[in-house]
């Protein structure tokens, strides 16, 4: 309640948050509406469902002050059911990927091109690879290199050596896959 009160006052254009915040807002503001039996029926009627989805989308955006152009989430995976509903509402959201050692962003995609269940594509200053024989089908460690990837840990050669492959790619410790378009799909931790 405190966060949404501040959002109404500040009226941000961009919201950067963790998925848990959006999931809690969904569960408190939207789920009670769309999970009613009558709403489930109405949401299944073509045409009428778009009117309902637009109203719900506006309710969500107004909860953030009414001026939000994009919601960027990161730090964890977004609940697939919540993502499904956000897509139905045409909510302008995306999920990015990064870590402190990457200052902090490594992957992102504009909300209108964002691939479901991904965390976007490597940003312009970063290359990402999957340490796998088949990075499109077999999970492997996500590795990165580029301008904003750290060069090492301050005064800690041992940790720096462990953080990089012999050919200079930073080990993220995250497991994932790529698709043909370069979208990254996180599957866990190594």
Positions of predicted regions on the chain:
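Short secondary-structure boundary segments
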Residues: 19
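Short Gly/Pro-enriched turn/cap motifs at secondary-structure boundaries
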Residues: 117-122, 164-167
């Amino acid at each position: 309640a405190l966060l949404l009160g501040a959002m109404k006052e500040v009226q941000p254009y961009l919201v950067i948050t963790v998925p848990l915040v959006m999931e809690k807002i969904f569960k408190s503001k939207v789920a009670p509406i769309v999970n009613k039996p009558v709403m489930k029926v109405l949401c299944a009627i073509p045409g009428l469902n778009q009117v309902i989805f637009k109203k719900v989308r506006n309710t969500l955006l107004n909860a953030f002050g009414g001026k939000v152009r994009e919601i960027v989430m990161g730090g964890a995976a977004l609940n697939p059911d919540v993502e499904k509903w956000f897509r139905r509402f045409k909510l302008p959201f995306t999920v990015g990927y990064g870590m402190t050692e990457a200052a902090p962003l490594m992957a992102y995609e504009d909300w209108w091109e964002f691939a479901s269940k991904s965390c976007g594509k490597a940003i312009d200053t970063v290359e990402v690879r999957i340490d796998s024989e088949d990075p499109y089908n077999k999970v492997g460690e996500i590795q990165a290199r580029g301008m904003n990837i750290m060069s090492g840990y301050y005064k800690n050669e041992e940790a720096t050596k462990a953080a990089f492959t012999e050919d200079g790619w930073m080990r993220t410790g995250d497991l994932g896959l790529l698709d043909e378009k370069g979208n990254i799909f996180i599957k866990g931790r190594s």
